[in-house]
């Protein structure tokens, strides 16, 4: 626990320095970061400020499409294609390209939204399934993992020893392991959060949400849960090792023979 707190403290310092260097560190944001000791929540807070590679959303911003994304997000404009036509220029060839770029911006914003990410996390907790398949051609080499060649089980019911076996099989290149929630339930929960009606803008928001979920949010949250399951398996391995070592150290040194002293 102490090591985790130290690690989180160092991470907070790095995050504060990064945001301050961008001249985006407000007093409220600083207080929030300083008060946060949950590593996952801390990364969610930092995500909108995290330096990005050249993403689809960043390309769209450079084309001047962020104001269009704002209009779509408000979900009030009834003639959005007509509005999108105003953004056609040397970099944007038509209204469809303008709407696609604005949707890319929205998808990235949804991925950086804590409520959206927590909504998907909740669905992972409720119904994620951990599954494994044997890597083609590894059947004979990985015979000891035969029980996991075509395996699936709700993650919340998967025991530590199964997690340990799955992660060992994955590390040895025998198994492909995946953690997946109910995709439909995840998208529905996001729609409940963000979609405000059934107009054209709302349809674009719903489409951007689906794209954000499949392309950005789901892979990110799956990585989180994979790391958590690995930690659970590692903790179990340490516990079993400690238990076995304890029994070994307490065992009579000469078996059934009586010992007066050593």
Label the model's feature ranges.
Residues 4, 8-253, 258-262:
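Duplex nucleic acid-engaging cores and interfaces of nucleic-acid transaction enzymes
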């Amino acid at each position: 626990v102490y090591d985790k707190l130290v690690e989180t403290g160092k991470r907070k310092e790095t995050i504060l320095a990064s945001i301050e260097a961008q001249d985006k560190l407000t007093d409220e944001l600083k207080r929030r970061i300083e008060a946060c000791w949950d590593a996952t929540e801390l990364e969610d807070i930092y995500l909108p400020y995290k330096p990005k590679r050249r993403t689809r959303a960043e390309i769209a911003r450079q084309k001047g499409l962020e104001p269009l994304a704002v209009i779509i997000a408000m979900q009030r404009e009834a003639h959005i294609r007509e509005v999108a036509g105003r953004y056609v220029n040397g970099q944007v060839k038509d209204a469809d390209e303008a709407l696609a770029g604005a949707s890319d911006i929205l998808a990235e914003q949804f991925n950086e939204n804590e409520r959206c990410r927590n909504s998907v996390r909740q669905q992972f907790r409720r119904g994620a399934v951990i599954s494994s398949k044997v890597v083609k051609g590894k059947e004979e080499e990985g015979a000891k993992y035969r029980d996991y060649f075509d395996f699936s089980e709700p993650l919340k019911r998967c025991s530590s020893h199964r997690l340990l076996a799955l992660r060992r099989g994955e590390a040895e290149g025998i198994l492909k392991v995946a953690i997946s929630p109910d995709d439909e339930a995840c998208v529905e929960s996001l729609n409940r959060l963000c979609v405000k009606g059934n107009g054209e803008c709302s349809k674009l928001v719903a489409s951007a949400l689906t794209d954000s979920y499949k392309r950005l949010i789901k892979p990110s949250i799956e990585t989180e849960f994979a790391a958590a399951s690995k930690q659970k398996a590692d903790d179990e391995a340490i516990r079993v090792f400690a238990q076995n070592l304890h029994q070994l150290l307490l065992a009579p040194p000469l078996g059934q023979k009586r010992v007066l002293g050593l």
